[in-house]
């Protein structure tokens, strides 16, 4: 039961298999979703979307002191270990300039989502302060409910409504505001049909019923946009030029390695001074994020000194 998961960041709290007894003690409702695998081991019924939601609730309570967490039906129920990996690798990136991870970093989460997952992890692990942007009223209401239900989070996480669905940073980053980093889990499909096909494929792999869509659900803005992931990130790169002196590092997940070459070309055309790729692995799943800055080494050091 103590086998290490391959590839997770060394500081990730989910290095080992889930301690289901401890998680059930934290969140008793998880108990009703435990099953026996063909090998006779106890596990969570991952084909049941309510089980996945209960597991997330237990993980957030047990490891990140989130005592109240819920999401509305139809929104993404994110895998916590993978989301934590992004936060830890981002911390390493922010620590490279000065040699230590900043304790008071300010982070912009583009598309914070109904689950508010990145701020919840980042606040607990590093004491960072987050601004979360969101185009969906329902998602924003859900995230705000999570923040208000947990003591102390309202001082560390603020939400801003993106009124222009075609904009990413514009309207969110205000004049005279400065961020150590932005992060984003972009929509990766290029159409609603492609998003449905991807969700259906995942459900089939788990033997899940068609109507049980919670853990592979997601609203339009979470799953797809015109032109897919590449088009979305290219727009992000183009917009980032406007805020080149207000943000130290712009970052985003990239779901497919084959999407990297056109993004690298866009970054070169935009005048990015430095581009970094961080590879991540959660079990068999490979993922990555790219980061870019418009500041050289001296400018990055001065930015941090002024901001602190």
Swiss-Prot record:
Q: Which locations, inside or outside the cell, does it occupy?
A: Cytoplasm
Q: Does the keyword rRNA processing apply?
A: yes
- Keywords associated with the record: Cytoplasm, Methyltransferase, rRNA processing, S-adenosyl-L-methionine, Transferase
For this protein, what reaction is catalysed? Answer: adenosine(1618) in 23S rRNA + S-adenosyl-L-methionine = N(6)-methyladenosine(1618) in 23S rRNA + S-adenosyl-L-homocysteine + H(+)
- Principal subcellular localisation of the protein: cytoplasm
Q: Which GO terms describe its molecular function?
A: 23S rRNA (adenine(1618)-N(6))-methyltransferase activity
Query: InterPro entries, alphabetically?
Result: METTL16/RlmF, rRNA_lsu_MeTfrase_F, SAM-dependent_MTases_sf
Reply yes or no: does the keyword S-adenosyl-L-methionine apply.
Answer: yes
One Gene Ontology CC term in the entry: cytoplasm
Q: Which GO terms describe its biological process?
A: rRNA base methylation
Matching SUPFAM superfamilies, A to Z? S-adenosyl-L-methionine-dependent methyltransferases (SSF53335)
**In which domain of life is the source organism classified?**
Bacteria
Q: What class of enzyme is it?
A: transferase
Q: Which Pfam families match?
A: Methyltransf_10
Give the enzyme's EC designation: 2.1.1.181
Q: Which PANTHER family match?
A: RNA N6-ADENOSINE-METHYLTRANSFERASE METTL16, SAM-DEPENDENT METHYLTRANSFERASE
The UniProt function text for this chain reads: Specifically methylates the adenine in position 1618 of 23S rRNA.
> What family does this belong to?
Belongs to the methyltransferase superfamily. METTL16/RlmF family.
Q: Know the name of this protein? A: Ribosomal RNA large subunit methyltransferase F
Lineage of the native species?
A: Bacteria, Pseudomonadati, Pseudomonadota, Gammaproteobacteria, Enterobacterales
């Amino acid at each position: 039961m103590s086998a290490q998961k391959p590839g997770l960041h060394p500081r990730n709290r989910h290095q080992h298999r889930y301690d289901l007894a401890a998680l059930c003690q934290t969140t008793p409702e998880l108990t009703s979703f435990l099953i026996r695998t063909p090998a006779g081991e106890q596990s969570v019924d991952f084909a049941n979307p309510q089980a996945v939601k209960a597991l997330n609730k237990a993980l957030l309570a047990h490891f990140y002191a989130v005592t109240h967490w819920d999401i509305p039906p139809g929104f993404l129920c994110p895998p916590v270990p993978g989301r934590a990996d992004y936060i830890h690798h981002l911390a390493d990136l922010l620590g490279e300039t000065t040699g230590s991870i900043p304790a008071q970093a300010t982070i912009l989460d583009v598309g914070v989502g109904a689950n508010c997952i990145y701020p919840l992890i980042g606040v607990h692990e590093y004491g960072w302060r987050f601004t979360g942007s969101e185009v969906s009223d329902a998602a924003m209401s859900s995230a705000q409910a999570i923040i208000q239900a947990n003591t102390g989070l309202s001082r560390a996480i603020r939400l801003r409504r993106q009124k222009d669905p075609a904009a990413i940073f514009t309207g969110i980053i205000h004049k005279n505001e400065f961020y150590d980093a932005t992060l984003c889990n972009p929509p990766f499909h290029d159409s609603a049909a492609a998003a449905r096909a991807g969700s259906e494929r995942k459900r089939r792999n788990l033997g899940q019923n068609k109507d049980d869509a919670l853990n592979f659900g997601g609203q339009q803005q979470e799953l797809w946009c015109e032109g897919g992931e590449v088009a979305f990130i290219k727009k992000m790169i183009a917009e980032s030029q406007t805020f080149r002196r207000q943000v130290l590092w712009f970052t985003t997940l990239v779901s497919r390695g084959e999407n990297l070459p056109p993004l690298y070309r866009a970054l070169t055309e935009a005048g990015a001074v430095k581009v970094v790729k961080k590879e991540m692995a959660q079990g068999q799943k490979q993922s990555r994020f790219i980061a870019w800055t418009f500041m050289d080494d001296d400018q990055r050091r001065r930015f941090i000194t002024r901001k602190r």
